[in-house]
Amino acid sequence: MKFFVIALIVLLGLLQYRLWSGDNSLPEYFVLQKQIAAQQEGNAKLNERNQVLKEEIIDLKSGTEAIEERARNELGMVKEGETFYRVVGGDRSVSSPSQ
């Protein structure tokens, strides 16, 4: 009977060792859970970005308005007969009147 109790205690000790400090231990599990959560958050951001790019591609394929807008904004192009005006702003901060 004593041998059985000692064997159970030794077995319990070995299992506790594996649980807390061996391979696939609880601390390692929690670290991996944090890494998974961070990766899923990053994946969600990338999926959102991909969706925006897909919508932009569809818009570019379907009509000329998006192409014209990109040409105007990114390449500085103007239509024939249009006049381009550049508005140069001064100080953008709004100051309140001093009292």
Curated annotation (Swiss-Prot):
<feature type="topological domain" description="Periplasmic">
    <location>
        <begin position="22"/>
        <end position="99"/>
    </location>
</feature>
<feature type="topological domain" description="Cytoplasmic">
    <location>
        <begin position="1"/>
        <end position="3"/>
    </location>
</feature>
<keyword id="KW-0997">Cell inner membrane</keyword>
<keyword id="KW-0472">Membrane</keyword>
<dbReference type="GO" id="GO:0043093">
    <property type="term" value="P:FtsZ-dependent cytokinesis"/>
</dbReference>
<dbReference type="InterPro" id="IPR023081">
    <property type="entry name" value="Cell_div_FtsB"/>
</dbReference>
<protein>
    <recommendedName>
        <fullName>Cell division protein FtsB</fullName>
    </recommendedName>
</protein>
<dbReference type="GO" id="GO:0005886">
    <property type="term" value="C:plasma membrane"/>
</dbReference>
<keyword id="KW-1133">Transmembrane helix</keyword>
<dbReference type="InterPro" id="IPR007060">
    <property type="entry name" value="FtsL/DivIC"/>
</dbReference>
<feature type="coiled-coil region">
    <location>
        <begin position="31"/>
        <end position="73"/>
    </location>
</feature>
<feature type="transmembrane region" description="Helical">
    <location>
        <begin position="4"/>
        <end position="21"/>
    </location>
</feature>
<dbReference type="GO" id="GO:0030428">
    <property type="term" value="C:cell septum"/>
</dbReference>
<comment type="similarity">
    <text>Belongs to the FtsB family.</text>
</comment>
<comment type="subunit">
    <text>Part of a complex composed of FtsB, FtsL and FtsQ.</text>
</comment>
<keyword id="KW-0132">Cell division</keyword>
<keyword id="KW-0175">Coiled coil</keyword>
<comment type="function">
    <text>Essential cell division protein. May link together the upstream cell division proteins, which are predominantly cytoplasmic, with the downstream cell division proteins, which are predominantly periplasmic.</text>
</comment>
<keyword id="KW-1003">Cell membrane</keyword>
<dbReference type="GO" id="GO:0032153">
    <property type="term" value="C:cell division site"/>
</dbReference>
<dbReference type="Pfam" id="PF04977">
    <property type="entry name" value="DivIC"/>
</dbReference>
<keyword id="KW-0812">Transmembrane</keyword>
<keyword id="KW-0131">Cell cycle</keyword>
